[in-house]
Amino acid sequence: MTHKRDSAPFRNFLTSIFLIVFLFSPSEKPPVFGQSITQQDQTILPSSDFNPCIRILSIDGGGVRGIIPAAVLERIEEETGEPVSRLFDFISGTSTGAVISLALTKPSEKDSQKAQFSAKDIVGFYERDSRILFPPPSTETEENRFLTSTKYSPEPPLNIFRQTFGKTGLKKSLVPILVPTYNIKEKKPFFFKSWVKSTNDYPMSEVARAAVAAPGYFPPVELPAHRQTSSPKQTMVLVDGGVFANNPMRYALENSYQLGNIRKGIFLLSLGTGKTSPEHPRESPYHWEEAQWPSPLKNLLFADPPISNQESSSQITLRMEPVIPAENAAMDNAREQNLLTLRNISKQMMNQNRPAFKRILRILKTPRPAGCFREGNLPD
């Protein structure tokens, strides 16, 4: 069933978001917190009595740099004593962030009400399997690039995702999940939405595979059209949603604000995968032969929609993203030392911003106010 709604309330809602960005260089003293990246001159944190109805998690794309947000979530689970699937009411992730989101909301085979994987398990996945997904250069990888115009074979991620998710369908996720991808066949974004009953229930393994199909790294993924009424011959050809929404926070807000009573507050935790300093800007991680990809895809690359930096007493977005050295920025640098460095940077970010991190923990541990949720009203 499609839910009609006026877009004006959402536009007004977006303009009332209060954005706090945590940015620091691992080799420098972290700046104080401010209202934007360029105005870090005053300490501004959520008030101690802020108790939002809706708690949203958004996780960026970034390949192996996904170990940065995974380590943050590991610390959150350790200090709250609760799994991510109980702390948040809605989760969205792009690319590697999608894999994290899916894994943390996959129900256990022994107890369908509990998550099978912890954030600690996800960190272990990066440490254990990254080199399988992104093997070092070899004759085999060069042959694969020659034959498919992509750097890596699609078989390793497919095998890992099938082992991880089995036959579990997306609609079994413990909380609503939003995964952005891009349909190059129709030249428009496609969002996997776990809560929409009128669409096919794609296996989590296939959703993950489409989510990480970064142009130039892995080939596109062809899946049946999403509507149950579609002809079996109708298909989608999907690539990594990072080509238009590497940071999915806006889409998370747009799709989740009908989840409950927004007048009682919304808290969005946005986790980045690291950015390089202005002196050493990170090159786009996506590369492809011009003849292979439609020009709209190239124009969309990293064109994340802007988010307003205005204060509101009932909607707060907290973004955590460290500055990382340029030599650690490649999305496919799966060397053990690089993963250790990224994990340590994540820990340093949390430790040096301990007051803010404690406030995040307090918000997540506080029971939600009464009368928060309305059932069955997420938009299709």
Model-derived segments and spans:
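Extended hydrophobic secondary-structure segments that form protein cores and membrane-embedded regions
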Residues: 56-59, 89-95, 125, 177-182, ...
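C-terminal helical/tail subdomains of lipid-metabolizing enzymes
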Residues: 51, 148, 219, 223-238, ...
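Active-site gating loop/helix substructures
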Residues: 172-261
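Classical Sec-dependent N-terminal signal peptides that target proteins to the secretory pathway
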Residues: 9-34
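Patatin-like phospholipase
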Residues: 37-41, 50-56, 67-161, 194, ...
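Conserved small-residue
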Residues: 62, 97, 161, 179, ...
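Surface cap/lid and interfacial helix-loop subdomains adjacent to catalytic sites
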Residues: 119, 128-129, 139-141, 145-146, ...
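N-terminal secretory signal peptides that target proteins for export/translocation
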Residues: 1-9
